[in-house]
């Protein structure tokens, strides 16, 4: 299994979901390699704490597109699963670049509408997902949403049809009634809801203006990991 964990913005819950999935897979006895889009070093510390192996950064700005491909290919050779945590919002990068066209065009199939080009931000999570041909697990912070969740999901999925959306994770869901409103709104999109994280301050990683608090300085992370390991986070 290989997945990119993306979100609609910073703070949506990408790291929490990534840690939850890593812990779940490790608990099942699988060998898992984690990756992080960009040069960030704090999130990889969380990953390594859970997996027991170094997280690898995928940064086409400081390296190159070819290096990103090579790095990913090299470090998934001896593992069962690979998870790539994205950066910021799905389409947030440093500049715009033009894709060569839909994969359907590359495969010699599809109509003209399907063969059009789409812009993508260089070094964004979307760029790396497209570069590595990986499906996207999309995390949405639902703490202040109900029906509007469908507009967000539809907008991100349709913005660049080249990306393969595997499904959604609904984060910070307040109650069963809240979940019902969200799922009812999302039904017409036929996007699988693959995970739900309930609102719980005990499983929130504190952050600061420069990113997440270092795990060595944050006892909250130990509460988070404990909750994950007893399956309170992932459902």
What are these regions (language model features)?
Residues 146-235:
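Internal gly/pro-rich beta-alpha loop/helix module
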């Amino acid at each position: 299994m290989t997945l990119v964990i993306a979100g609609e913005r910073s703070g949506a819950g990408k790291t929490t979901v990534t840690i939850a999935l890593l812990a779940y897979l490790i608990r099942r006895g699988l060998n898992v390699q984690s990756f992080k889009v960009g040069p960030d070093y704090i999130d990889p510390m969380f990953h390594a704490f859970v997996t027991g192996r170094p997280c690898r950064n995928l940064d086409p700005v400081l390296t190159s597109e070819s290096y990103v491909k090579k790095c990913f290919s090299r470090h998934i050779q001896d593992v069962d699963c690979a998870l790539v945590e994205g950066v910021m919002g799905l389409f947030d990068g440093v500049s715009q670049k033009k894709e060569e066209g839909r994969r359907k065009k590359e495969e010699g199939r599809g109509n003209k509408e399907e063969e059009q080009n789409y812009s993508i931000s260089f070094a964004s999570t979307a760029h790396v997902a497209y570069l590595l041909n990986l499906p996207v697990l999309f995390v949405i912070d639902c703490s202040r949403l109900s029906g509007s969740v469908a507009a967000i999901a539809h907008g991100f999925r349709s913005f660049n049809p080249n990306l393969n959306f595997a499904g959604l994770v609904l984060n910070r869901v307040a109650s069963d009634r809240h979940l019902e409103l969200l799922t009812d709104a999302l039904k017409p999109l036929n996007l699988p809801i693959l995970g739900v994280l309930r609102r719980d301050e005990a499983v929130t990683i504190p952050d600061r203006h420069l990113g997440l608090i270092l795990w060595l300085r944050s006892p909250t992370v130990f509460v988070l990991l404990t909750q994950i390991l007893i399956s309170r986070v992932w459902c």
